[in-house]
């Protein structure tokens, strides 16, 4: 199996209007979507679309209606004139722990049958239950950089008139996902996630859980705690204007 676990850190650094920094330890799963049934059968304490200590549910991603994520990815590739024949799809995300998860960012890596990356989908969620997916065609897998305009309200302390610059590594022994956010050509936020690879086995899953117990509950608590600290620093609260459910944009 090619699915694996990454243990690492998440870092956020805000530069404007005031400096704010935090760093948390996390673990993520990189799941080959074609292996989910096998993982469900072979990995203790992990389930697919069923409750367990650690689990993965289709309804947490894509159309969020429980439909197969492979079909959702293929549909969006076809709509963006990217071939969906003989592809492999891997998803980097947090799992559910005791049935709960919040994924601020999930990344779909799409490979052709030569194991070349041909597309990346950045699935962004906010705490209002909304989601926006940015779809990119990969033109050079040795230089995985993408930029686009911000199309989705995420933080109540950052305006919408911003742009994103994504820099990532092709998953291997390490992962790296970096997002720089700019406003009027000034960098206002740096966010990153890194990790070191571990095999997806029962023992490694338990080790990762014990290093980060109740991680997904801590993530949502940390989001609100850091927001409170921003508010105490006097940073302006920005009201969300639009209500959406699940938007997608094709960026190139």
Where are the predicted features?
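Mature, function-bearing regions of proteins
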Residues: 1-252
